[in-house]
């Protein structure tokens, strides 16, 4: 492989707990040093690397001698608080072997939801990269509550890729990639080597497999891949135990499942809407509204809303769905759930008389919307 001819200039590598522990209950330092070697080789070849690492809770369990704790949020936070220091120490020591420094960024959903904090996180990330320091990103599980759930770091790595305008996102797991059926139950399952479009049939293939120590499954990796590719970022899902896997992926060799980036990626603000904010509610749209939004690029009007799901304030990101629950778009609502329930199915010129005020004709303006 010729690192001097690499087309990528900035790469995000996500390592799952199953990769870091090699299926055991503790961090596999021998394997971690091999992964650090590959990332260091990229840095020295002029490719900037961002590492999104899981493993804090597993490291905490190991450091405390595998205590028998109830499976509660508080205990997960305890383990994460203890383990995060051990995890960053391990990575710092391993990268120092190759003369590289690391910097730690612990993020929560709130850091990505607020536009100003989102931009500040981006500036911190870029400052580290511009000074030849490897940013190491993890979910701030010690203070987060809702974030300790399936898929946090898969989605976090995609958001990190958007933050730093990466060219490639590598999601390393204990599977070779995405298969046409579950390879653990079907020995004839075939690896899908190339994905151009992510649709419902592909999401069904991803299933919901979850490793014993981690929190991510193939379904969440598919979600992360979809976020990244919409921003013009290529994605590879591959086995973290394959020899030279990071270098192979960056050199575009035949490894894992490769997801092609969209030719016309979303502009920066819409990337933030899609990746920076968690949807807090849903609007069910009629057929006409779905066509107007998805095919004609129009704003969503109250007339096209059939029903409101959830409680939320104005300025909240919502999922726009059809009658079968399929999401067709995501956008920022100009009205609260309480207001929307009063104007559902009504014409825009009736809003002020019904509410006593209005925030514009559109419930979700097209500039605040991402069509999926």
Curated annotation (Swiss-Prot):
GO cellular component: cytosol
Pfam families: AA_kinase, PUA
Residues annotated for ATP binding in this entry: 14, 173-174, 215-221
Stretches assigned to the PUA domain: 280-358
Keyword annotations of the record: Amino-acid biosynthesis, ATP-binding, Cytoplasm, Kinase, Nucleotide-binding, Proline biosynthesis, Transferase
Subcellular location: Cytoplasm
GO BP, one annotated term: L-proline biosynthetic process
Enzyme Commission number(s): 2.7.2.11
Catalytic activity field: L-glutamate + ATP = L-glutamyl 5-phosphate + ADP
Pathway(s) it belongs to: Amino-acid biosynthesis; L-proline biosynthesis; L-glutamate 5-semialdehyde from L-glutamate: step 1/2
Cross-referenced InterPro entries: AceGlu_kinase-like_sf, Asp/Glu/Uridylate_kinase, G5K_ProB, Glu/AcGlu_kinase, Glu_5kinase, Glu_5kinase/COase_Synthase, Glutamate_5-kinase_CS, PUA
Superkingdom of the organism of origin: Bacteria
Gene Ontology MF term list: ATP binding; glutamate 5-kinase activity; RNA binding
Entries under CDD domains matching the protein: AAK_G5K_ProB (cd04242), PUA_G5K (cd21157)
Entry function: Catalyzes the transfer of a phosphate group to glutamate to form L-glutamate 5-phosphate.
Family: Belongs to the glutamate 5-kinase family.
Protein name according to UniProt: Glutamate 5-kinase
Provenance organism: Shewanella woodyi (strain ATCC 51908 / MS32)
Source organism phylogeny: Bacteria, Pseudomonadati, Pseudomonadota, Gammaproteobacteria, Alteromonadales
GN (gene name): proB
